[in-house]
UniProtKB/Swiss-Prot annotation:
GO cellular component: nucleus
Tissues in which the UniProt entry reports expression: Expressed in mature leaves and at low levels in roots and young panicles.
Annotated MADS-box domain residues: 1-61
Superkingdom in the source lineage: Eukaryota
Disruption phenotype: Late-flowering phenotype and elongated internodes.
SUPFAM superfamilies from the UniProt entry: SRF-like
Lineage of source species: Eukaryota, Viridiplantae, Streptophyta, Embryophyta, Tracheophyta
PANTHER family attached to this UniProt entry: SERUM RESPONSE FACTOR HOMOLOG
The species this protein was found in: Oryza sativa subsp. japonica
Encoding gene, per UniProt annotation: MADS50
Stated name of the protein: MADS-box transcription factor 50
Length: 230
């Protein structure tokens, strides 16, 4: 008689479940013993029944095997974590390197380099992106120029306002009179006249006779010759 295949699901009947547990438990304990003897393996088996009863088997000592397991897992989990971190860092670095290479290739294509390997679709896509970039650049340039023009206009208006204020101030101020300079020689005109008169000497003596004769050489003789005898 061929036995049917047992379905791997929870047995709903409590009695059948308990019978199956007892059979499988004994078989599991037997297999653990055979494994420890035939393969010289350290085996520890702990089983709790549905009612909470403990069944165990250990080739050496259950407690020692548990401590060995804890030590092993602690060391290997730490090493495994470090190794996983290293592998993750390497994977991230490789991914970043690939992205950087792709960006460099795309940059060269935008600059018009290495276009021999591009298809028509790729070239068209590059053309569209370049046109969009140019539109964005021109828009930004126009905006900056408009801002500069607005600043210059504000500066012009301010200068005009300052100029008008200066003009109003100049209109309200009285005109400046020319400074009066008095020459030293004009302060005392009488002194100038006296000085001039002092410097002018006029001889009023009368000379009778021929011109060119000196009074000192023969003034008396000439007077005697010129006068008629009585």
């Amino acid at each position: 008689m061929v036995r049917g295949k047992t379905q791997m699901k929870r047995i709903e009947n409590p009695t059948s479940r308990q019978v199956t547990f007892s059979k499988r438990r004994n078989g599991l304990l037997k297999k653990a013993f055979e494994l420890s003897v035939l393969c010289d393996a350290e085996v520890a088996l702990i089983v709790f029944s549905p009612r909470g009863k403990l069944y165990e088997f250990a080739s050496a000592s259950t407690q020692k095997t548990i401590e060995r397991y804890r030590t092993y897992t602690k060391e290997n989990i730490g090493n495994k974590t470090v190794q996983q971190d290293i592998e993750q860092v390497k994977a991230d670095a490789d991914g970043l390197a690939k992205k950087l290479e792709a960006l460099e290739t795309y940059k060269r294509k935008l600059l018009g380099e290495k276009l021999d390997e591009c298809s028509i679709e790729e070239l068209h896509s590059l053309e569209v992106k370049l046109e969009r970039s140019l539109i964005s650049i021109r828009g930004r340039k126009t905006k900056l120029l408009e801002e500069q023009v607005a600043k210059l206009r504000e500066k012009e208006m301010k200068l005009r306002k300052d100029n008008e204020e200066l003009r109003e101030k100049c209109k309200n101020q009285p005109p400046l009179s020319a400074p009066l300079t008095v020459r030293a020689e004009d302060e005392n005109p009488d002194r100038n006249i006296n000085t001039t008169n002092d410097n002018m000497d006029v001889e009023t003596e009368l000379f009778i006779g021929l011109p060119g004769r000196s009074r000192s050489s023969g003034g008396a003789a000439e007077d005697s010759q010129a006068m008629p005898h009585s």
